[in-house]
Amino acid sequence: NDDEKNLTIARDIGFPVIVKAAAGGGGRGMRVVHTEANLLSSIQITQSEAKAAFGDATVYLEKFLEKPRHVEVQVLADKHGNAVHLYDRDCSLQRRHQKVLEEAPAPGVDPDARAQVLEACVTACKNMGYVGAGTFEFLYEDGRFYFIEMNTRVQVEHPVSEMVTGVDIIREQISVAAGNPLSVTQDDVVLNGHAIECRINAENPDTFLPSPGLIERYHPPGGPGVRVDSHIYSGYSVPPHYDSMIAKFITHGATRDEALKRMEIA
């Protein structure tokens, strides 16, 4: 609520900046500010929206990148001081700031930048004593990573990391919660091929609004390198009370092209 401090921070970051609700998520509670003249009013509006939506008016400022990619790092850590990364994922394909397609590893990332950020994420887990599965999210532009946040939970897109490393993230999460050490070391985590996940949503394709109702026929795809995570079945009624995602289709291949082709066929 300190106007002068907010202006100073924004000037130091450099316009454009983005005002974000600290308690926000799913693409809500964000406002881009291109000029200094609009900063204070944008902060006030975002605070009001955040208070109404999340019960918390706290906001913060970040540098707004014009053409970034969304790249994140999957980590696992236990109570014995061990931590590993399961490489990275690209989640750039979104609508309304919500992910719809994810892949691992993230294509076209500078190798040196990747190595540095993977090591930094593992070091951060050890330094803070983190336990469980987690994801460090970044924006990536022009060979540089910009930290967004850490999600201290399992994410929807975790299967692509499982497919390219062979590590069962859910099993490890439950095991370390019970006090056991990780069953893998960093040397055990070997990148194998490429994986892609498509989120299947019960939505109107024109408006992207949720479309609850009866699923008359459901025939999931199968075959080599194809995985389906879902709870639905023929005759299932999609309720109107929850998120519209009803399934995840994941494909794995020796190369990105093979994973894409298998997804296209699926």
What are these regions (language model features)?
Residues 1-22, 29:
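A conserved helix-loop-beta module that forms one wall/lid of the active-site cleft
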Residues 21, 26, 33-266:
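ATP-dependent carboxylate activation and anion-phosphoryl transfer catalytic cores
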